[in-house]
Amino acid sequence: MEYFELMFKTAKELEESIVAILEDVDSIGIAIEDNFFDESILWDYIDKSFSERNYILIKAYFDRNVDIDRIIDKIRTKIKEIFGEAKVEIEYRIIREEDWTNKWKKYAKPIYLDRIVVLPSWEEIGNVEDRILIRIDPGMAFGTGNHPTTIMCIEMLQKYLKEGMDVLDVGTGSGILSIVAKKLGGDKVKGVDIDEKAIEVAKKNAEGNHVEVEFQKNDLIDGINEKYDIVVANLIAEIILKLNANVKRVLKTDGIYIVSGIVQEKLDMILNSLRESGFKLLEVKEKEDWYTVVAQNED
């Protein structure tokens, strides 16, 4: 199968908003590379500043049968509306699915945390001692464990999840957080994502890790009536803001709410939203300019 791969060179601080735009135009997969350099990409415009550390490469994937020129025009219009004349270079090419998969193998590395080791499915490893080993193949879904937001969510699950708790993972992507929750002793664990491809990948990853997790194609928490001890959502600020207004409906009393994918410019907005929704703020964690917030439902 073939896909369009769109590549965006942009300032690191624009990452969250660019990802939101890409999700809005129905991208089926997004990858983010820091300190990038790819000789196989021939850009129309090369600027020396793009090699500096504050620039990133965002890649988005679309089905081969879409009108890619129309999508690019829509993306450029949205970027101009939000950022004006901000520097964002866009190129695209056609790739095969196996090429996309092999690129993950180049950038995905083992992650060693307090109680957990996250390992790309194709990697071999020696003795992990008493750590929990989780193997992840992202396929066409977001989430290998390498991104700071994913790492922080895993750390917060390690801290707050007690054996027998029920966990809801909103925007599950590759299923990594759902699998972590189950491995840490979660009882009923459910992962939801609006992307059908992500659900397929998450199910395969759960099978590969020999855990039972329910994965469901869903728009955030629409139609979910069960209550959970923990809700974790590694999304972007604008979507978290929407989720904040209704998430108590699926949280038990004293339930823990973990949100990540927040840049500094949007942090106060999220904190104020949580306070207005009646949450008790427990902690704010930062890693590489990304923020994770943990709150508690006192209702």
Curated annotation (Swiss-Prot):
S-adenosyl-L-methionine binds at T150, G171, D193, N234. It catalyses: L-lysyl-[protein] + 3 S-adenosyl-L-methionine = N(6),N(6),N(6)-trimethyl-L-lysyl-[protein] + 3 S-adenosyl-L-homocysteine + 3 H(+). Its main location: cytoplasm. GO terms for cellular component: cytoplasm. Its EC number is 2.1.1.-. The keyword Secreted does not apply. CDD domains: AdoMet_MTases. One of its GO terms (biological process) is methylation. Keywords: Cytoplasm, Methyltransferase, S-adenosyl-L-methionine, Transferase. GO terms for molecular function: protein methyltransferase activity; protein-lysine N-methyltransferase activity. It is found in: Cytoplasm. The keyword Cytoplasm applies. InterPro entries: Ribosomal_L11_MeTrfase_PrmA (IPR050078), Ribosomal_PrmA_MeTrfase (IPR004498), SAM-dependent_MTases_sf (IPR029063). Methylates ribosomal protein L11. Belongs to the methyltransferase superfamily. PrmA family. This is Ribosomal protein L11 methyltransferase. The gene is prmA.
